[in-house]
Each structure stands twice: as structure tokens, then as C-alpha cells.
């Protein structure tokens, strides 16, 4: 295997030469014998930033591939006393050993099935960053997380979570769903709901503290706390979102029944079960923003800063975003400028989920009125 050296964050890494695995001038990281995706750099930068707030003593990267994520945590955060880097691919674990030595990282490196490993150990922070769906690893990852510890999941199977693929959504995430105008946000709410339900099985409450959508994936961090009563309170915030495709009316209910729009008389589209609470712990979010000044070396520093600024404003509003082009088309009006809408609504912000959307806790009628006068 021909290796090349790259640098990411403060880590120097050996990875398989992508040129050796090109097909007709194209390259996909999954074609390499050891997976390394440069497009996930922002994901890893933000994760390093999040861990600078969490300050874990023990970390598990259960699907390590090249080892980049765990190695960066160790070298850039400090204070990690126990690091486990795991991959079931023996070629990957051999490369992880080289990369760990190269960066003076003291880690336990294992070649195990991720679920098997996670049922054997406990850690302050568990990271699940799969190629595809995290669903097969959710329960074991929560089980491996100590009380008042943290776990993070990446999901790249947006076709399931956003309900482009209904059968996949049902199989992986127990979703009964159709595509709504704000499906980009519903996807992350569906993922959160699934994690909460999996934690409920073993009476562990999974509180979402930081979430974001970027490019083609979701990333969510949870704080885990033991206790059946805590779990019950979280489960009370699982519900179904409904939207009328004719007038844009929407509502939330806690039962998966079919509903007729009270205004138009047509059957509304639905999505659920989904998390109906906050996507961000504001204190955690502000701590991340404060710590960012220590990571000016990030290649994605400007992107991360911009994203955090949006999230700080967005976190003021619990309700899912409204898509302006969707509502404007229903009332046969031109799409207004977002700035005009924010000025009209007064209590609103842009959203990172969709450049066509705005976040507000106001109702559809107020959105419609603002579109009409702008």
C-alpha cells in the first residue's frame, strides 16, 4: 500500500495515496483500503472544538479508519488519559498504529467489531462516525458512555432521515414520514428521537446539546444521564410534525394519526417520531464560540466561526424553520429577501439548515403577512 503524508489540524497522518484508487479520473474515499475523507475536515474541526468544552479523560473512537479523529483529539485537546482507537479492518489498525506513533499518541488500538468493543468498555466520550447510518451502533455507544458522559453521532444517510427513502427511514429510524418543506431540519430531529429511544431501553437519558447539518451529513452531540424519570421526560418531547401542502399550515401532535388540514380539508403530510425540543444547549454553544479563539489554525476556521454565529441566533427559536420559497409559491407571491422578512418578523433568524429558510416561533399567518407586504 502506497502511503502519502498529509496534515490535518495538528496531526501528521499517513493515508493511502488517493491516486492509486481512482477510477476513470474519479476518486471516492470508500474505494481506498483505509477510509479517509477530506470533506469531513469541518466535522472533525468542530468535534475538536466541542471536546475542548467537554474535556474528557477517556475517549473511544469506535470506527477509527485512519485514526485521524482520535489522534486529533489527543494532540489538540490535552488531558486525555485513556484513548481507544478501533476498527474491524486489520489494514486500518496497522495504519492507526503508524499514525499514533508518528504523533506520539498513547492509545489502545483494537481490531474488533465496534458493537462488541462498546459492550466491553466505558468512557467519558464515545464517538460514532460511520460511513452511512449510525443506527446499528446507537445502543452500544450509549451503553459505553458513563453517567454524565457524552456521545456523538454522524449520519450521512440523509435520504432515509429526510424521508426521500421511506422504507429505509422506517427500517433504520422507525420513522413514518413524508417529505415536508423543512425536511432538512426534521432529519436531525428524527435522528435525535431515535437516539433518545435507544437510550430509553437501558434507562439512559440522551440530551441533545449540539447539532448541525453540513453538506451531506448530520452531527449531534449528547450528554448522557442515568435515570428512568429523566428518560420519561425526554420521551414526552417526541412527536409528529404535520404540514399542509396546499396552505402551509403546520402543527405538532404526539400520536401518529392521519390528520386533515383544518383550513383546507386535505390530508396533511407527516414526519415522526421526531424530537420537538431544543437542538442546542445554549451554554454549551456559547462555550464553543468562546473557545474557538484557541483554534485559529483550523483550515475551516472561518466556516466554523460563521456556522457558530448562525447557530447562536438560531438557538433562540425551538420551532423548525419556514421555507420562504415554499410559502411564497402557495400564495403566488415573489420570494421576499430574507433581510426584509427578518425585519418584518422582528423575532427571527436565518437558519444553517437551508438558505431559503428562517427560524421563528411565530405562526404561519404572520409569515404569510410579511411575505405579502414585502
Swiss-Prot record:
<keyword id="KW-0808">Transferase</keyword>
<feature type="binding site">
    <location>
        <position position="114"/>
    </location>
    <ligand>
        <name>S-adenosyl-L-methionine</name>
    </ligand>
</feature>
<keyword id="KW-0819">tRNA processing</keyword>
<protein>
    <recommendedName>
        <fullName>tRNA (guanine(26)-N(2))-dimethyltransferase</fullName>
        <ecNumber>2.1.1.216</ecNumber>
    </recommendedName>
</protein>
<feature type="binding site">
    <location>
        <position position="87"/>
    </location>
    <ligand>
        <name>S-adenosyl-L-methionine</name>
    </ligand>
</feature>
<dbReference type="Pfam" id="PF02005">
    <property type="entry name" value="TRM"/>
</dbReference>
<feature type="binding site">
    <location>
        <position position="113"/>
    </location>
    <ligand>
        <name>S-adenosyl-L-methionine</name>
    </ligand>
</feature>
<feature type="binding site">
    <location>
        <position position="69"/>
    </location>
    <ligand>
        <name>S-adenosyl-L-methionine</name>
    </ligand>
</feature>
<keyword id="KW-0949">S-adenosyl-L-methionine</keyword>
<feature type="binding site">
    <location>
        <position position="261"/>
    </location>
    <ligand>
        <name>Zn(2+)</name>
    </ligand>
</feature>
<keyword id="KW-0862">Zinc</keyword>
<dbReference type="InterPro" id="IPR029063">
    <property type="entry name" value="SAM-dependent_MTases_sf"/>
</dbReference>
<dbReference type="GO" id="GO:0000049">
    <property type="term" value="F:tRNA binding"/>
</dbReference>
<dbReference type="InterPro" id="IPR002905">
    <property type="entry name" value="Trm1"/>
</dbReference>
<comment type="function">
    <text>Dimethylates a single guanine residue at position 26 of a number of tRNAs using S-adenosyl-L-methionine as donor of the methyl groups.</text>
</comment>
<dbReference type="GO" id="GO:0160104">
    <property type="term" value="F:tRNA (guanine(26)-N2)-dimethyltransferase activity"/>
</dbReference>
<feature type="domain" description="Trm1 methyltransferase">
    <location>
        <begin position="4"/>
        <end position="371"/>
    </location>
</feature>
<keyword id="KW-0489">Methyltransferase</keyword>
<keyword id="KW-0694">RNA-binding</keyword>
<dbReference type="InterPro" id="IPR022923">
    <property type="entry name" value="TRM1_arc_bac"/>
</dbReference>
<feature type="binding site">
    <location>
        <position position="44"/>
    </location>
    <ligand>
        <name>S-adenosyl-L-methionine</name>
    </ligand>
</feature>
<feature type="binding site">
    <location>
        <position position="244"/>
    </location>
    <ligand>
        <name>Zn(2+)</name>
    </ligand>
</feature>
<comment type="similarity">
    <text>Belongs to the class I-like SAM-binding methyltransferase superfamily. Trm1 family.</text>
</comment>
<keyword id="KW-0820">tRNA-binding</keyword>
<feature type="binding site">
    <location>
        <position position="264"/>
    </location>
    <ligand>
        <name>Zn(2+)</name>
    </ligand>
</feature>
<dbReference type="InterPro" id="IPR042296">
    <property type="entry name" value="tRNA_met_Trm1_C"/>
</dbReference>
<keyword id="KW-0479">Metal-binding</keyword>
<dbReference type="GO" id="GO:0002940">
    <property type="term" value="P:tRNA N2-guanine methylation"/>
</dbReference>
<feature type="binding site">
    <location>
        <position position="247"/>
    </location>
    <ligand>
        <name>Zn(2+)</name>
    </ligand>
</feature>
Amino acid at each position: 500500500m502506497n502511503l502519502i503524508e498529509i496534515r490535518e489540524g495538528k496531526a501528521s497522518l499517513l493515508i493511502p495515496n488517493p491516486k492509486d484508487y481512482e477510477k476513470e479520473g474519479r476518486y471516492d474515499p470508500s474505494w481506498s483500503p483505509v477510509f479517509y475523507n477530506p470533506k469531513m475536515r469541518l466535522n472533525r474541526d468542530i468535534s475538536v472544538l466541542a471536546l475542548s468544552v467537554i474535556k474528557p479523560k477517556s475517549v473511544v473512537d469506535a470506527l477509527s479508519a485512519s485514526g485521524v479523529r482520535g489522534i486529533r483529539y489527543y494532540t489538540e485537546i490535552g488531558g486525555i488519559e485513556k484513548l481507544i482507537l478501533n476498527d474491524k479492518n486489520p489494514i486500518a489498525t496497522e495504519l492507526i498504529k503508524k499514525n499514533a506513533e508518528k504523533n506520539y499518541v498513547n492509545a489502545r488500538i483494537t481490531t474488533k467489531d465496534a458493537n462488541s468493543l462498546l459492550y466491553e468498555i466505558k468512557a467519558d466520550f464515545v464517538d460514532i462516525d460511520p460511513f452511512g447510518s449510525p443506527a446499528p451502533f446507537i445502543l452500544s455507544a450509549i451503553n459505553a458512555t458513563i453517567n454524565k458522559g457524552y456521545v456523538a453521532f454522524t449520519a450521512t444517510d440523509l435520504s432515509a432521515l429526510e424521508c426521500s427513502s421511506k422504507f429505509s427511514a422506517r427500517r433504520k429510524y422507525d420513522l413514518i414520514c413524508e417529505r415536508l418543506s423543512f425536511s432538512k431540519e426534521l432529519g436531525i430531529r428524527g435522528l435525535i428521537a431515535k437516539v433518545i429511544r435507544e437510550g430509553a431501553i437501558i434507562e439512559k437519558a440522551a440530551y441533545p446539546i449540539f447539532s448541525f447539518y453540513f453538506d451531506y451529513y448530520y452531527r449531534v452531540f449528547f450528554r448522557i444521564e442515568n435515570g428512568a424519570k429523566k428518560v420519561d421526560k425526554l420521551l414526552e418531547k417526541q412527536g409528529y410534525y404535520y404540514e399542509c401542502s396546499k396552505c402551509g399550515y403546520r402543527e405538532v401532535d404526539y400520536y401518529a394519526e392521519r390528520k386533515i388540514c383544518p383550513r383546507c380539508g386535505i390530508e396533511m403530510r407527516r414526519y415522526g417520531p421526531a424530537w420537538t425540543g431544543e437542538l442546542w444547549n445554549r451554554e454549551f454553544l456559547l462555550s464553543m464560540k468562546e473557545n474557538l479563539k484557541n483554534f485559529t489554525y483550523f483550515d475551516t476556521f472561518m466556516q466554523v466561526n460563521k456556522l457558530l454565529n448562525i447557530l447562536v441566533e438560531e438557538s433562540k427559536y425551538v420551532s423548525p424553520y419556514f421555507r420562504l420559497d415554499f410559502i411564497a409559491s402557495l400564495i403566488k407571491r415573489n420570494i421576499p429577501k430574507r433581510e426584509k422578512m427578518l425585519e418584518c418578523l422582528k423575532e427571527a433568524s436565518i437558519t444553517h439548515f437551508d438558505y431559503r429558510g428562517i427560524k421563528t416561533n411565530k405562526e404561519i399567518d404572520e409569515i404569510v403577512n410579511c411575505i405579502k407586504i414585502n
